Amino acid sequence: MLKYHFPNVCEDELINIYSYGDFKGQGKYICLFKIENQSFLFWRNDKGNKIYTNLESISVEIINTNNTYNQSQNVCPQDLVDTYNQSQNVCPQDLVDTYNQSQNVCPQDLVDTYNQSQNVCPQDLVDTYNQSQNVCPQDLVDTYNQSQNVCPQDLVDTYNQSQNVYTQDLIDTYNQSQNVCPQDLVDTYNQSQNVCPQDLVDTYNQSQNVCPQDLVDTYNQSQNVCPQDLNVYTQDLIDTYNQSQNCDCGCK
């Protein structure tokens, strides 16, 4: 006979005994025995009686470690398979719900508190923010509009008068000084530029178009009429010329 133990199970730990899915009893674990290739569970029931049970027909659940040991050689009973799957792979529904609520979904009051504190400012802070950041107080808006976008009316009037519309006396002065010369300057200009003074006109006409009479006479006398001494050859020169051209000089 060989005595041995389940791994990591100590004596007197609380166990449940199942046979083909049916609950058979609860007791305290003592040890295991192996006799001629057969294994037996040695345990004590709730009445204190010591019992040997063949492990081939039972499965044992260690209560305090939540481990189930199926010692059958062929197939685990379906209820133990279900129990194992539920306890290992799938949490009981109440634990699943608790987990989902505590881990994935905050309780509604915490969600609300979070939303209010993190995502949504309290209404008074929202209002304060909107007023201080996004919307200026109305008096500041008015002041801003008046000082930035719209000049006070007296400044607008002053600007329009001084920038866009010249005062009438400046307009008149400008027109008179730039576009229209004063009449005396116009007259002077016309007289001095377009029409020469009469004495200059006369002088010009006399000096350019008509020579003075003495120059005309002198010119006519000097150009059209040879001086008397040049117009009439001396008689002795004429006679000499005629003799030299017309007379036979005796040369044959």
UniProtKB/Swiss-Prot annotation:
Sorted alphabetically, the keyword list is: Plasmid, Repeat
sequence repeat ranges, renumbered to this chain: 68-82, 83-97, 98-112, 113-127, 128-142, 143-157, 158-172, 173-187, 188-202, 203-217, 218-230, 231-239, 240-246
Q: Does Protein biosynthesis appear among the keywords?
A: no
Keyword Repeat in record: yes
**Induction pattern:** Transcribed starting in early sporulation and into later stages; not expressed during vegetative growth. Second gene in the orf1-orf2-cry2Aa (cryB1) operon.
- Region: 13 X 15 AA tandem repeats; residue ranges are 68-246
Function noted in UniProt: A protein probably derived from this gene is found in cuboidal crystalline inclusions, but is not toxic even when coexpressed with upstream ORF1. The protein runs anomalously as a 50 kDa band in gels.
Miscellaneous field: Encoded on an unnamed 225 kb plasmid.
Q: What is this protein called?
A: Uncharacterized 29.1 kDa protein in cryB1 5'region
Organism in which the protein naturally occurs: Bacillus thuringiensis subsp. kurstaki
Classification from the root reads: Bacteria, Bacillati, Bacillota, Bacilli, Bacillales
